[in-house]
Structure formats: C-alpha cells, structure tokens
Swiss-Prot record:
InterPro entries: SfsA (IPR005224), SfsA_C (IPR040452), SfsA_N (IPR041465). NCBIfam families: sfsA (TIGR00230). It comes from Escherichia coli (strain SMS-3-5 / SECEC). Keywords: DNA-binding. Belongs to the SfsA family. Binds to DNA non-specifically. Could be a regulatory factor involved in maltose metabolism. PANTHER family: SUGAR FERMENTATION STIMULATION PROTEIN A. GO terms for molecular function: DNA binding. This is Sugar fermentation stimulation protein A. CDD domains: SfsA-like_bacterial. Residues 201-220 bind DNA.
Length: 234
C-alpha cells in the first residue's frame, strides 16, 4: 500500500485530549492534527519525534490533517492510525501474503457472530473448508525489540478472545491476528504486565484451538505492507 498523495512531515509538539496533536512543520507553521488512536500510544508520541501526516480534501473537517506515522528519534517507524491494521491485513490476505490464511475464495468484513454479538473483523470462506474467523489487533508497544499487546487493560479484547474460543468449540477456524506496526519489533508476546487477564485468556484460547498469528509490516513514509511472520511467546 502506497500513500497517495504523499505524506507530509512535521515535528511533534504534544498530543492531548487523546484525539489531537500539535506539530510544527519544516517551514515553521504550527498545525493541529487529528490523532486516530485512542490508546496509550506509549513510545509513539514523544515530543520531538517526527510525525508523518495526511491531508483530507474534505472541507467540512475541522481538523483536515491526520497523524499517520511516527518516526521515533531512534529511527523506528510506527503506524499510529489504528485503521490501517485492518486495511493492511485485508490487503495481505487478498494478495495471499499470509500463507496461513491463503486458499479462501470469499472474504467478508464486520460479520456479526458469537453469544456476545460481536463483529468479527474478517470471515474467510471456501468450499469444503470450515469458515475462518479473524480478529485483528494493532501492535505498536515495543521494549527492546519485544512487541506487546495490549498497551492498556482491554475488556473489549478479552471479550473477543472469549468469542473466538466459542467459534473454535463449534468446529470453525478461529484466528487472532496481531498486525505489528512498529519497525523495531522482532517478536511478540501478550502484555502480561499491563493486562494479566488478557494474557491468561490468550493462553487459554490457544489451548482451546484458537490460532495466534503475528505479522510485521514493512513501514516507510512512502507506504506499508504486512510481510513477515514473527515468533509468538505466551
């Protein structure tokens, strides 16, 4: 996936009110960007980091600029726009870049399922194969090349794991897919130190037949694509 039109560069002043960020452009203009990430964004929003942003041609938007990527002072690229996790995963499935999810003839998005009436990110179907239910999570929290999810306690994420376990128990294929959107991450684990319940449920889910996949995106200011499978340690 290529950014079109190209992203523009600025330097982060501050992120505030969760949805806003002030930046300064190379020519000295101060702008307020929309921040499409409600999470903690630990390590992704340090003042002085380089920010790459897009600009909408929708004249009705109060904040036409959207924060897409952070380039940390160590040089790592991080995708902070959480919408890209699903878009990149869909693109990779359709391109058959994810070998574990290849060979299906149909892909549906936002399908209702489960006792708790969740919406699954993707459902894959093919003749003579069980339906495949895929829940996607964006991974940006990093420490010494170790990627973690979640970056805050997530009751919603816990619910999704319970739903996937129910799917697996019914004989369907259930997959939790971690889209790693941080260029410095080389391996993945659940963030037990942040949400112990989620880590416990993830281990239980694996034991009950839920598949756990982690794929890392190649990231740059020009574009992004999910390419590489990463090791997962529970």
């Amino acid at each position: 996936m290529e950014f079109s039109p190209p992203l523009q560069r600025a330097t982060l002043i501050q992120r505030y009110k969760r949805f806003l960020a002030d930046v300064i452009t190379p020519d000295g203009r101060e702008l307020t960007l929309h921040c499409p990430n409600t999470g903690a964004m630990t390590g992704c929003a340090t003042p002085g980091d380089t920010v790459w942003y897009s600009t909408s041609d929708n004249t009705k938007r109060k904040y036409p600029h959207t924060w897409e990527l952070t380039q940390s002072q160590s040089g790592a690229f991080i995708c902070v726009n959480t919408l890209w996790a699903n878009r990149l995963t869909k693109e990779a499935i359709l391109n058959e870049s994810i070998s574990e999810l290849s060979g299906y003839s149909s892909l549906k998005s936002e399908v209702k399922y489960g006792a708790e009436r969740s919406r699954i990110d993707f459902m894959l179907q093919a003749d003579s194969r069980p339906d495949c239910y895929i829940e996607v999570k964006s991974v940006t929290l990093a420490e010494n090349e170790q990627g973690y999810f979640p970056d805050a306690v997530t009751e919603r994420g816990q619910k999704h794991l319970r739903e996937l376990m129910s799917v697996a128990a019914e004989g369907q294929r259930a997959v939790i897919f971690f889209a790693v959107l941080h260029s410095a991450i080389t391996r993945f684990s659940p963030a037990r130190h942040i949400d112990e319940k989620y880590a416990q449920l993830l281990s239980e889910a694996q034991q009950r037949g839920v598949e756990i996949l982690a794929y890392k995106a190649e990231l740059s200011a020009e574009g992004m694509a999910l390419k590489k499978s990463l090791p997962v340690t529970l």
